[in-house]
Amino acid sequence: MSNETRDLYNYQYPSSFSLHEMMNLPTSNPSSYGNLPSQNGFNPSTYSFTDCLQSSPAAYESLLQKTFGLSPSSSEVFNSSIDQEPNRDVTNDVINGGACNETETRVSPSNSSSSEADHPGEDSGKSRRKRELVGEEDQISKKVGKTKKTEVKKQREPRVSFMTKSEVDHLEDGYRWRKYGQKAVKNSPYPRSYYRCTTQKCNVKKRVERSFQDPTVVITTYEGQHNHPIPTNLRGSSAAAAMFSADLMTPRSFAHDMFRTAAYTNGGSVAAALDYGYGQSGYGSVNSNPSSHQVYHQGGEYELLREIFPSIFFKQEP
């Protein structure tokens, strides 16, 4: 039994061919596969598959020519492998180049930091220059701000003050006022009151205080000029109030002062503050008592006013 098994494994078929013989079979005459002569010293029985793989391109070409009747040129066989090598080199170059560029990009911050460390004086000088420029800009802006504030202060409206003997602090002048503040006066027991005109878009202000030297004297100071006519007619003289509309008044007019003199001379009740709202100036102290008024004027101007105003205003009391 053991002998039969051994013979089974060692049995060789007579009609079988080796791999080398099959590779060297000619294609032109299939009947001659079992009887292959050696050509040019090529013995297929001694040429193994390993030798075929390790053979040179010339031997591999001759083997193909003898076996299958093919004669490919060496350029056609190895063209693909040759063409692939430059592509591989280019790919490697691109990859290597990208890596180099990334390395250079990453290294650049360290290079800049090292350059900064090598030249600390230049950086300190630049930063110092920047601080100086910022300081100069701040100084210029401060100067411009101070100049603007000074200009705003210079645009303050002119002030005109009047002294009147009266027991009442707030004298009637034909305009409506609103009290918005009160302040103590230094070296005086009497406070100072602040008023504002109630007409819209009118910025006229006035302040009223009593003199600490003579408590019977009321000092009224007007700031600005009214831009509207008198809202109400004054007591007892509507014609006089109409004559002094805003379009006929001019600052510091001597005619206005002379009219005030005529009004008091005739005993009318036109208040002395009629002209205060327009910012006119008096040439002396005005007394609320018509019998004891005191106003100074020039002779030539007085004669001119007599021709302009009705004569009834210039009648002298006996």
Swiss-Prot record:
GO terms for biological process: positive regulation of leaf senescence; regulation of cell fate specification. Transmembrane segments: none annotated. The keyword Nucleus applies. One of its GO terms (molecular function) is sequence-specific DNA binding. GO terms for cellular component: nucleus. Residues 116-126, 148-158 have a biased composition (Basic and acidic residues). Belongs to the WRKY group II-c family. This is WRKY transcription factor 28. The lineage of its organism: Eukaryota, Viridiplantae, Streptophyta, Embryophyta, Tracheophyta. The gene is WRKY28.
